[in-house]
Amino acid sequence: MVMTDPIADMLTRIRNANQMSHAKVLIPASKLKLEILSVLKTEGFIKNFYLPQSSRDIIVSLKYAPNKEKVIKGLKRVSKPGLRVYATAQQIPKVLNGLGVALVSTSKGILTDSQARISQVGGEILAYVW
């Protein structure tokens, strides 16, 4: 089966597993997905992720608060294959007035909205996470 938007598929898998309070979720591997997951881990939205040697799937450990409250409240794909969304460093929006992050694909790799503003680089706005 051909997937037209693998990033949206990854976000949907994380969203669905999060809603059902699963501890882990499997995601088909790619370099871009690994980079996005690295940013999500750095920002504290997921616990961990790893790619086993014998597998093509990334295993993502989701993060929950001590009272079983979900850390990820929402995920939204912004730039889609049919409608790409680009922004300069000054045009990158804040997500929930800074409570969430925008994932931006730049020439320096995948950055959060605040990192992109500090680095003065724009790019494609991939998703919002809050």
From Swiss-Prot:
One of its GO terms (cellular component) is ribosome. Transmembrane segments: none annotated. InterPro entries: Ribosomal_uS8, Ribosomal_uS8_CS, Ribosomal_uS8_sf. GO terms for molecular function: rRNA binding; structural constituent of ribosome. The keyword Transport does not apply. PROSITE patterns: RIBOSOMAL_S8 (PS00053). GO terms for biological process: translation. Part of the 30S ribosomal subunit. Contacts proteins S5 and S12. This is Small ribosomal subunit protein uS8.
